[in-house]
Amino acid sequence: PFTVANFVTLAEGKNNYVSPNYKGIHYYDGLTFHRVESNPPMIQGGDPTATGQGGPGYKFKDEFHPELNHGKAGILSMANSGPNTNGSQFFITTDQTSYLDGKHSVFGEVVDGIDIASTVVVGDKINKVKIVRIGQAAKKFDAVKVFKEYFEKQAELQKVLEGVKAKKVALFQDIKTNGTKSKSGLIYKITKPGTGKKPNAGQNVFVHYAGFLEDGTLFDTSYASVAEENGVLDLARKQANGYAPFPFSYGKKTGLIAGFIEGLENMKFGDKAMLIIPGYLGYGEQGTGPIPPNA
């Protein structure tokens, strides 16, 4: 419902979370379709800058439902730049695009005029978006209230997440103080011993992991539960069974960062360990993705 509330409040000029220059205006009126594609087949609009980079001044999370999919032409769905980065940009499919399921939030459908959508070209203008409420459920739907409640809930969740991060930081400090420091500078601690047997060199093992920055920010994990606890669960990845341990040839010296490999070499089957990996044993000065330089 909050995805619909987003669109409705923007269209009616009642969205209280937009940047000041968009306050009180009918956001979509006069904007253009800045992107028209054949693969994926769709027309995209909702960007006041017409560059594909613009938005309302906020982002909100994905909202999926198994009955809402991209299985045909005329589906209205949110454009994004990755998980939980929805704003104001939307697209309308001009053919089935089922491979977008679990990646983009469906919130509407063209019931009349899909033939017009197929003739749209880049630069065509959206003259006006008018919200017409048909039926009691639609008339009772308070878009302003629904969107407000979404952000209030997100604020509460953020407080919880800050608490989770604070506990992680305290745990990391404890490991730094009480863990074992190797000659390389890696600090590690076996937090839960396993079977006591060490893998043979070349033996294939499966490794679960959760990677955090020093401030407690989770940057990646093989555990869906850890991702959810830290507020970064990727539903598409979960649906694709992407949260799983990865295979690794024990004793191999390549394929992972040096600190991770060294940590694994200090572990046995079933062990759980905490590793404090200095930047020079990680991604170094260049960093990578969400991991900054020297982290």
Task: Describe the function of each predicted region.
Residues 1-295:
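Cross-family detector of peptidyl-prolyl cis-trans isomerase
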